[in-house]
Every structure is written in C-alpha cells, then in structure tokens.
C-alpha cells in the first residue's frame, strides 16, 4: 500500500496548522546568532512556524492529531500508518525546523519507552527458577532481597527521641496485655485461618537472626520459604530427590511447630498441592519439557528430571499461594467478601504507557524493612482457643513456669531448646501429636479436624490491651529490637506512607485511659515510638466493602502498600509469570476464576489436599477466612446461601469398582438396591419437574418417563433414514467448511487437514440437536442466532459433564455454575419455540403444512426456508449453510445442503408435550431439556475413540471398511455399524455411578489386566487368572460404586476374543450404551449417527492421522488424586477409563477434544 503525500492547499490550512503547532510547541523565539562563535559550536539557524506551515499539507493535521491521541492513550494502531505518516511529515519540514526537532524527539522517546531499560527478565539459566535463598530475583541486583542480608530502612528517623524511653515491660503491662475475662472477638468474625496464613506470610519474609537483629534469615519475597526452606540445604531436606516431589506432609520451618497446629496444617496443604502439581506435570509433559531418562543409571538425567519438575512445581504452587493472598486474604482484609463484586486489589495489573502516565515498575526486586517487621506483629488477634494452646505449649517448654510471668531470658532459652529438640529431618517431625502413617503422611481426617476447628474459631480483634499474657516476653523482645534498629517514630512513619500525623493522643486513640498512659510515657504524640504506637492505636471500624481486617489505622494503609510492593516487585509473579514458564496447565491450575466465588481461589488448595472430605460446594473449603455462622449471614444477604453446603467436612467412603460383565449386569439390572446418582444434578439443571425424568431416579415415574421418551423418539417410520441422511450430509458439510489444504498446489488433489473431533464429530451431534429442537444457530458471517456451532457444542458437553462426568471435586462448583447457565439459556429457547409451535405461528410453517396435505410430499418447514425431497433444498433453523458462495456441490452440480429435522423435531416435541397434560415449562424442563442434555457428549466421545482405534491399532481393518463405505448399500451400512460398535467397545471408556441403598454382596472378578508392553495402558490383556481373581464385595449402605462398562466390554465371558474385531456379535450385546432399566433410550439413533459419520470419514481418500502429536488423542489412565503422593491406588486393577486434556493442554477433560486427520482431494465432497 502506498500512502499519498499529496500537498493540500485547502483554504485556512496555514492558520489551522499555525494554531495547532503553537498549541503543541508554544511560541518560542529564535536564538541569537553570534558571528564570531567557536567553529564547533555553530548550529544551524532554526526555522519558525511560518516556514513549517508552508511545507505541510492538509493531511498532516490529521497525522499530528493521531500522534497526540496515540501519545495520550499509549496505544498505536499501526493500521493507520502513523509511523509512516510521521516520517512523511518530518521529511517535509526544513532541516533546521524547531518544531520538527521536537516531533523527532517525541518519536524517539516513544520508541525508547516501548522497551524496558534495562530489561527486567533474562533467558540465563540462573534466572529460570527461584533460588532457594531468594537471590537473582532482580537480574541486575542478584543479592537484593536474598536471605541472610540486612533489613532495609523505610523511614528516616529525624525526631529527637528520648534516650530513656519507657520500660518495655511497663508498655506491655499497660498498653498491650489482654484481660482474659475481656476477650474481644473480631468484629467481622474473621476466623483464625486468616491469621494462620498471615503467620506464614510474616515468617516467609521476616525471620530475624538471634545473633544479629539487623540480618533477615529469609528472603524478602513471598516464595513460601516456610515450606521450601531458606537455603539450599533446607530445601534439599524437604525434597525426596525423585520426580520433583516433597517428602509427604513436611515443611521446612521449625518455628511453625511452635505455632497452633492450624498453621502447620495450612502448610501441609501447600505440600500436598505441590506434589499434586508435579505429578500432573509429569503426566502431561507439555512439549516434552520434562525428559524422563530411559535407564536407571543415568544419574545426571534423573537429577535434571527431578529438578525441572520440582522447580516448575514450586513456581506453580507459589502462583496459587500469591493468588490466595490476593484473591482470598486481601479480599477479606478489604471486606470485599461481603459484597457482590469481583473487583480486587491486584498489583499485577497491566498498565499502558502513555503521555500522561508511566506504568508502575515491576520485577525490580524487594528488600523488606524493619518498620514492616514491626507492622506485621498481630498477636492481639490470637483467639481464646489459641491463647490457651500457646500458654500450655510455652508452660511445657518452660518446665511448668507461667509464660506471663517468666523472665524474657528464660523464655528465650526455653524456646531455643524447644527448637533445638525438633528433628532436623522434616519427615521425622510431628504435628499436634499426630502419628505419621506408613506412607509418611498424616491421617487426612485428623488434619481436616484441625482445619475445621480453626475455620470455626473466631479470631481476636485488633486494638490496645488485647495481646495474650503468654506473649509478654515476645512483645518485650520486639520493643527492644525496634530500639536497636533506631526506627522512626509512629508519626514519621505515617508521614512517610502518606498519612497525616497524629496531632493529639486523642487522635491516636480516643480511649481516655489509653490517652493518659501515652501522655505519661511520651509527653507528645510526635515522640511515640513506632511499635508501641501501633499497638496503642485505635482499630479501624468495619466498612463493607473497604475495611474487613479492622487493624490499627496505620497498619491498615501500610500493609496494602507492602502487598503491592511484594507482588509487583517479584519477577516470578510479574514478567516471568507466564504459561510458557510454568506450562499452560500450571498457569490455569493456579489461576483465579472470577466466575467462581467472586475470584476467591483457596478452594483449590483444600480440594487438592483433601479430595475426599469436603463437598464440592463446602463453605469450609471455599470461604475459610470467616467463620461459617457469619458466612451464612453474609451469603443470605447476597442471595447465594443455597449455592453452598454448610455441613462440616466428613470423610467419604472410597468408590468401589464393579468390573466383570456378570457383576455389571447384576448391579445395573437391580433398581431396588442400587440407585442412579444423577437425580440431584438433573434437578439442579432443570428444576423440580425433572425429578421424574427417566435418568433422574429409579421410581415408577422415572420408568414411565423412559417409555414415553422412547416412544416419542422412534414413532416416525422414517426416522432412521432421516437421521442417516442428516449425519451424512452434515458431516460432508463440516469437512468442507473446516477442512483446509495443507500440502500441494494447483488444481490436482491436495492434502487436506481438519480437527475431526472439534470441527466434525462434535459439531455434527450439536447440529443434530439444534435441528431437532430448533435451537437457532448463527450462520457464517452473520450475528443472527443464539449459538455459534462450537458454542452450542461446548454448552451441550458442559451440561452433560455436570450430570455424568462430575468427578473432579475441585472443578465441580465451576462446572455446575457453567452448566446451569447453559441449561437455563437452552431451556428458554426451547420453551419459546414450543410456545410458537403450539400457537401455530409462522407463515412458512402454515404453508408447509398446507403443501404437505395437497401433494403428499415430505415437507419440512422451518422459520426461514422449506425442504422438499423433490428439490433437495435443506435449511436449518436459520437458513442454509453455504461455503460463502451460497451453494455446496459434490462436483456434479448437485447442491449439498445442511438438512433440517425440524418437522421430525416438532413432532417429537408434540409427542413429549402430550405426557400427563403438563405445562410447556414443565415438559421442557422435565423431559425435553434432559433429552437434549444426554445426546452430544457421549456420542462424540465414543466415535472419537472408535476412529482413534481404527487409525491406530485397528488400521488393518480400514481397507475393508473403506470398501463398504463406498458401496453405499444397506447391507454395507449394516456391516459398517458392526465395525463402529466394535471400535467403540474396544477403545471406548464408559462407567456409570450407582449408590448402594441396602447392604449388599456382589460376586465379581477382574476380567482383564494391564498390558506391560503398552505404555498407554489403553490395550488390556485378558486375565489368565480370572478365576483366582474372584471376590465377594461387601457393600454397605451409602457406598458409591463405579460400574465399569469398559472392563465389562473386555470380559471374555461375554465377548470372546475381546481384543479382536468380530462382526458376529449381536448389537444388543454391546454395553457401552448401558445395561438394564437405564440403558440409553436413544441407542438406536446413536448407532445410526455414529456409523453415518464414520461412513463419510471412511470415504475420504487416503484417510489417516495428521503427522506427529497433532494426529493423536492425548489421554492418560484415569485415576483419582488421593490427596498425597506415594499412596497406593485404592483399586490397582485395569479400569480402561481415560482422562484427556484440552487442545492447549491447559486443563483435563473428560472426553477427547482434538485429533487432526489428513486426506487427499480437491476440496469437493
């Protein structure tokens, strides 16, 4: 493109330019020129505005305006060619133009400001991961903030301070000590759990050396050093040295052992989260970045493997840690947890550069100061329960002495001995008297009990006279430390952080008693020491939102500034916190989701540490920083109390697998003793009317619903032909629409590629549901319609997953929220269509019915077009799917159409509406919507796995299958159906939950075992010792069962030669659609749908996988994380169940999401 430089002499141009340039540059005088100046000082005589204006054109006004606008906004739309136009403008000006020089300077400044100077990130190996001691955070100042370096000073102390300050013991006894009879609960009912995290944060960045108070033994970064250690030796002590794991339920800090047990239990959750993370990282192995050695003697390779996993796992765990700090801790501090808002104070905000502002620096490092060491001493918030625990623990350490009266020297000596007696090996330490189990971990139920009691424990309030007496020696030491540091006064510090100084003792604290004591000790507010002053300050009142922590006024402001500095200054939380550094999955796993809990994220920590104790919507796991009773009031006010469970955590019994075909059939056929578990989810999605839907229960009403649905689905005689043709035509259309040539040129055959799962199989089923139930789809290039095709597919999968695949407790609430929103939208659209259908509205609908009566033709009318079998023109709910030119052809000029099933669907809806005379809304939510929910996801899953089998292990069958597909006869189609069902049986992975409602015993066997030669664990072997594997399972009431249809499909007792494709198996023998009273009601339709899509795919010339990982389905043996690494699986036998990942591998998925295929062709299908 050439940008014109045409000179525009429009009237008034000179005046407009002169005004603009005067506004930008001002009216400056030319400098005086001296004729006898030194030779090297001569400068060209600058030209003025008049000369500039003569050179410029009308379009240059726009260029200057765009330049100014870009400078103010900090964003340059390069499609406007601003840079090129500025160069053209500058090139027109005289060489010595004064204004031209300023514009050039501005352009250079803009280009300079586009980059960091100096850079804040580096590709050096020494900067990839956190160092154990925190060094190398700032790549230019590697020791900044490292452990074992001096504290910083924030505030210059200028005020003359009394050389004889008040006695520390007197300060404590008059301003700080708590009267045991006058405990003040926190005004916002914050639980002790928040202050346990505060304790971890404090000891993460402040650990004063007992030998030199000026030295900080830990780093100045929030890097979880209490868990990981402060140096290399401490870090190696908590690591197993294998697979990136930490030793089970360990943490580095000895000091934590001396705190209430909830602090240690909190750290153990981070330990377990870390081990969960590295286990999943190794499983996914994104891009092959974690190279597992192939030989046991490759010592260096194993060390690299372990370290890469450990360091990446640490970055991810710290990422969750900082998101908990910002998303849960800071939100509670600001009382945002009481407001219906997702706003949060997140220092990692992305600021743009502009003329009016520059972004706050980031990744510059940090060095904590002595002032903030004092700010973070919050002993007044110790609860009554923890006061008693601490007093007893200190009394025991003191040999029976009361810590409230013991000398400071005795207390320090006793605490030193206490820490000395703690084993150096973290795995040998205990917590609250708990005993380690054989796997090295503590008992989950006992840890959960500690956490539950801590969540229910109301913390203390801030303010004077509220520090437990047992902390007397600790507080006296703190006052003495502050004096050795020569810190500034309270007022000096307040001025430093931008607050007004206290002008009176009353301003500091209106309590007359406190005022009198302060006046006696310090004479003037300006003389009050920082630490005693903070402890004596009044606490802020609650504001909702605004003030939730309610600390002293100075603390309230200071901690927010410090939080911003700690996070924004940390390279690993800013410029290097990227999916590339911590993997897509790791980035996603640690991230907050504003759609869940308003951005709170601590539930991930609870659920990964204790997956079998907290319900998916437990308020204990989602909001532990406020006691449950107060949370109940908060959520009632927000109208969200019914979203959460208020029951205390409780261990759930392990899931019992049922594996053999005989046992599977026995369980699935018995509705009396084994009940389906889908009812609550179906009710959640569709409301009370859905409780009688076929799959929602095992009562007579559910059975009646099943019979009604089957009758409605299969009543039309022509339904098989309708379904078959729909899927064949639709599949061709999707291949044409989404396939693209990737090799070859010219008019000859070219290699095409398509994501067959995402863009063909899934969308074919989604289109079927849209056409059948008149869900309006958006046409290509248009905005009309309620759904894009992929959007509808995702909605259907999400709804299905909430009912049948809700197995990840951590993501369950998010899944339920998303599925509920999708179901509500879908229900409303279907109900609207049903009402219009019942009213008989729509001209084309009436015309179609009339034509049907007159001609007897098979007429399908929708809202926008007509299909007749004589003309072959199809439309869906909104029109014709075309390739952009309006018509698809098969090469012979015959139009390809996107067929509609609307009349078939409308008849189906009419039949469903006839049930029991229910209202439209009741029928839609109770029958129609559940039918829609049940269709797409499972069919996509089965066909994807079937195709995967035949493009891999079963490829020897492809030539015969392709031959059959090309015959296009009913006999050939029947054989293709058998091939399809066999592929689904061999590679499909299906299981169904059941609940035991009466004590039972089931005889079961293990029909197949893992194949050691198959690293994917997808191909089992028949168990040669199946008779010896016989066992009787004692099932008590309440037991959850997973009825494994995958193992049943590989049981030789039911399927001889289970690993071979055999076409002599009866269609009714297959179990991947279920067995018994709840066998899939839509199985006949599904069979035709699957085989029809498969048929079209087989007709592709040269059908094959795309090369490399793109052509493979990434899957892993399904297993439930047991809460800690090293625990043996509850049922180690082969299950055949698989888990998958999203296409970008950022999340696990219950079904395959992507697989690319290639074929040869000219693009016509």
From Swiss-Prot:
Binding site for heme b: 203, 379
PROSITE patterns assigned: CYTOCHROME_P450, PEROXIDASE_3
Positions of region (Epoxy alcohol synthase): 666-1161
Active site (catalytic residues): 376
Span list, region Disordered: 1114-1134
Residue positions binding heme: 1080
EC numbers for this chain: 1.13.11.60, 5.4.4.6
A single GO BP: response to oxidative stress
Top-level taxon: Eukaryota
Residues that coordinate or bind Ca(2+): 204, 219, 221, 223, 225
Keyword Hydrolase among record annotations: no
Swiss-Prot/TrEMBL keywords: Dioxygenase, Heme, Iron, Isomerase, Metal-binding, Oxidoreductase, Peroxidase
Reaction(s) this enzyme catalyzes, per UniProt: (9Z,12Z)-octadecadienoate + O2 = (8R,9Z,12Z)-8-hydroperoxyoctadeca-9,12-dienoate; (8R,9Z,12Z)-8-hydroperoxyoctadeca-9,12-dienoate = (7S,8S,9Z,12Z)-7,8-dihydroxyoctadeca-9,12-dienoate
pH-related activity note: Optimum pH is 7.2-7.4.
Co-factor(s): heme b; Ca(2+); heme
Gene Ontology MF annotations: 9,12-octadecadienoate 8-hydroperoxide 8S-isomerase activity; heme binding; iron ion binding; linoleate 8R-lipoxygenase activity; monooxygenase activity; oxidoreductase activity, acting on paired donors, with incorporation or reduction of molecular oxygen; peroxidase activity
InterPro entries associated with the record: Cyt_P450 (IPR001128), Cyt_P450_CS (IPR017972), Cyt_P450_sf (IPR036396), Haem_peroxidase_animal (IPR019791), Haem_peroxidase_sf (IPR010255), Haem_peroxidase_sf_animal (IPR037120), Oxylipin_biosynth_metab (IPR050783), Ppo-like_N (IPR034812)
Region of interest called Fatty acid alpha-dioxygenase, as start-end residue ranges on this chain: 104-448
Pfam family, one: p450
Entry PTM: The N-terminus is blocked.
Subunit structure: Homotetramer.
Its biological purpose: 7,8-linoleate diol synthase is a bifunctional enzyme that converts linoleic acid (18:2n-6) into 8-hydroperoxy-8(E),12(Z)-octadecadienoic acid (8-HPODE) and then catalyzes the isomerization of the resulting hydroperoxide to 7,8-dihydroxy-9(Z),12(Z)-octadecadienoic acid (7,8-DiHODE).
Similarity field: Belongs to the peroxidase family.
Protein name per the record: Linoleate diol synthase
Organism in which the protein naturally occurs: Gaeumannomyces graminis (Turf grass take-all root rot fungus)
